[in-house]
Swiss-Prot record:
This is Small nuclear ribonucleoprotein SmD1b. GO terms for cellular component: nuclear speck; nucleolus; plant-type vacuole; ribonucleoprotein complex. Residues 102-116 have a biased composition (Basic residues). Keywords: Nucleus, Repeat, Ribonucleoprotein. Involved in splicing regulation. Facilitates post-transcriptional gene silencing (PTGS) by limiting the degradation of transgene aberrant RNAs by the RNA quality control (RQC) machinery, thus favoring their entry into cytoplasmic siRNA bodies where they can trigger PTGS. Does not participate in the production of small RNAs. Disruption phenotype: Post-transcriptional gene silencing deficiency and developmental defects, including reduced stature, leaf serration and early flowering. Smd1a and smd2b double mutants are embryo lethal. The gene is SMD1B. The keyword Ribonucleoprotein applies. InterPro entries: LSm4/Sm_D1/D3, LSM_dom_sf, Sm, Sm_D1, Sm_dom_euk/arc. CDD domains: Sm_D1. GO terms for molecular function: mRNA binding. It comes from Arabidopsis thaliana (Mouse-ear cress). It is found in: Nucleus speckle; Nucleus, Nucleolus.
Length: 116
């Protein structure tokens, strides 16, 4: 399972996120999108070497996140189970020649032969 798909299941979980610049964000996840952008509510934002600031809502861009600190009470086994089974691609049927394969079949003599 991809990390982003796992994180998308963490709605209403309280987590801490450390950013690449050393900032610590502690809040409740309201959503995570496919770019790992994380939206939180009831946030306590602690800039490196500064006093904490309380915010109602905060969105963190995914590429700024260093790591998530998940609560110990979180049941990882149930979250890691994939909800939808993967669909296997269909194999081509026997006896059928796929179009667009090979080099120049059925298109005449080709180029640059000089009429030999």
């Amino acid at each position: 399972m991809k990390l982003v798909r796992f994180l998308m299941k963490l709605n209403n979980e309280t987590v801490s996120i450390e950013l690449k610049n050393g900032t610590i964000v502690h809040g409740t996840i309201t959503g995570v999108d496919v770019s790992m952008n994380t939206h939180l509510k009831a946030v306590k934002l602690t800039l490196k070497g500064k006093n904490p600031v309380t915010l109602d809502h905060l969105s963190v861009r995914g590429n700024n996140i260093r790591y998530y600190i998940l609560p110990d009470s979180l049941n990882l086994e149930t979250l890691l189970v994939e909800d939808t089974p993967r669909i296997k691609p269909k194999k081509p049927t026997a006896g059928k020649i796929p179009a667009g394969r090979g080099r120049g079949r059925g298109r005449g003599r080709g180029r640059g032969r000089g009429g030999r």
